[in-house]
Amino acid sequence: MQRVTSYLPAGTPSSHPIAQVKLPHDLRHLRRKLLHLENGEMVMLDLKDPVLFANGDLLVRDDGELIEILAADEKLFEIRGRDRTHLVELAWHLGNRHLAAQIEEDRIVILRDHVIRTMLQGLGAVVLEIDEPFQPARGAYHSQGGHSHGHDHDHNHDHGDDHGHDHSHSHDHDHEHGYEHEHEHRHDRGHDHDHKHD
């Protein structure tokens, strides 16, 4: 079986892929995974670090041949506002709920969520159901330089028992990333468990 240990960004000149692999957005964050290509073949992706791939990126096989990554169609909502200011306000509400969103000049695209649709319609948005590739904006945790987006999240949360804020969002991490996703959570609750009793 052919292996892939390197990649090229979309738009690389003189690139002629011999095969393609279609992946939804939540399966394009990869390090090591067996990929099933559109032509029925398989290839083993084995990268040094996790990478968040975009539509059109190219995987380089050990024999030098290229495989193009395509963003698969997904069930989405297209959100439109009355004007640009209204659209920015809608984007703020979505960001406040930590939702993955594809931000464009005249619309916002998100995964279908009927609770969110009701909220957006209440804010005056037009919400349409669409099926197309989804390329959400990369969050602050992803490196902005190049494609090496390792998840080095060092969560130093100082968790008091009373948070004082309401997180009205759910994190349904049904993501098959294909790599070891290690989060180091160091919770400082002010407890010293080294109890020395005289």
UniProtKB/Swiss-Prot annotation:
Compartments, record wording: Cytoplasm
Q: Specify the domain of life of the species encoding this protein.
A: Bacteria
Question: Which intervals of the chain are annotated as region Disordered?
Answer: 137-198
Alphabetical list of SMART domains matching this protein: UreE_N (SM00988)
> Which Pfam families did the record assign?
UreE_C, UreE_N
Query: Where is the sequence biased in composition, kind Basic and acidic residues?
Result: 149-198
Chaperone recorded as keyword: yes
Q: Which InterPro entries does the annotation name? A: UreE, UreE_C_dom, UreE_N, UreE_N_sf
- Result of knocking out the encoding gene: Cells are dependent on nickel supplements for growth, suggesting that this subunit is not absolutely required for urease activity.
Q: Which keywords does UniProt give here?
A: Chaperone, Cytoplasm, Nickel, Nickel insertion
Using the record, list the residue span of the signal peptide; answer none if the entry has no such feature: none
Query: A GO term (biological process) for this protein?
Result: protein-containing complex assembly
GO cellular component assignments: cytoplasm
Major localisation:
cytoplasm
| Coiled-coil stretches noted in the UniProt entry, renumbered to this chain | none
Molecular functions per Gene Ontology:
nickel cation binding; unfolded protein binding
Q: What protein family does this chain belong to?
A: Belongs to the UreE family.
Please describe what this protein does. Involved in urease metallocenter assembly. Binds nickel. Probably functions as a nickel donor during metallocenter assembly.
Protein name (record):
Urease accessory protein UreE
